[in-house]
């Protein structure tokens, strides 16, 4: 880990991890092989459709498409993750920077394969551009916005997985 600058919306006191992306678990979680070992990265400011976890936790529409879109952007590429904390699952919470300097997090939202993570009054939203990017994707009918009735992943986890109202 090396200290990272507070530029580009990344908080001061953050840290950078650099290495190849060796796994794309879903539309907002990847594994990066850093010099000290593999690190699970939870992409900040976004929440992608949930993959299924057996019969008790069915997946959301567009979960596979979201994972595939992210894989097309990052799989096998050496990237820098600008990180600022670890979450309750011991994942580094980061912005993934693509080789051209763009944010993979923003690219997921722009393409309509993730939501701006506005749950809990925006507690998880670090990038203030995300709601506007989501609005543009929705208005253009991109990705999951191509069909009506899209349910935010945080609502899906509660309603479907906890309350069994899928």
Task: Identify what each model region corresponds to.
Residues 1-166:
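Small beta-barrel nucleic-acid-binding modules, primarily SNase/OB-fold domains
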